[in-house]
């Protein structure tokens, strides 16, 4: 990294920009419930002497994710569904941050990825606000998995605006949720977060590869939104 840039950047692992950026993805989800700084730091400390070992990165994030997931499921079983859902949200994010560096994707990695998806889905059952739905958007004879997050409060006198999020290279819809979606829905803007071709579930389990003509898969996404009665299309 350029020396001047390094002075301006928070680099948890100064010798490895990629790992520092990956850990920052974890830390940056904290304001929206996707991480707890102490938990992320605990993972970072365990990795200090193994910088660059992507298998170790995966194992330590998965270890933390499983610990947090177990606590969340225990809370839910005890009737503390709000705190349980918070744990599951963080576990979902940790599973996905840990899996992102695995190339090629292994069965172990795909299993961890799906645990993250399951944690997010299970948390949604207990989160009353913002209200969200897991939806499937018809596309090329199959569908794109997505999360629709309702505007809060709903506009009783009219329709609401909406924003679409498509994932980046190695981001998932579950991670994207913890990147400010709650702030938008609190301002009365609905959000649709999509695992498009080449991302998330679409590439891992549906063989939908990245393509350059974004309009090909964006069009059915916007058609889906336009068909929702509460959206101002």
Placement of each model-derived feature along the sequence:
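Active-site glycine-rich loops that stabilize anionic/oxyanionic intermediates
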Residues: 160, 165-172
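Amphipathic alpha-helical repeat scaffolds of TPR domains
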Residues: 59-70, 85, 89-98
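An N-terminal hydrophobic leader/cap segment in hydrolases
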Residues: 29-42, 92-135
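Conserved alpha/beta-hydrolase
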Residues: 183-201
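Long, non-catalytic architectural segments outside compact domain cores
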Residues: 1-57
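Alpha/beta-hydrolase active-site loop
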Residues: 208-233
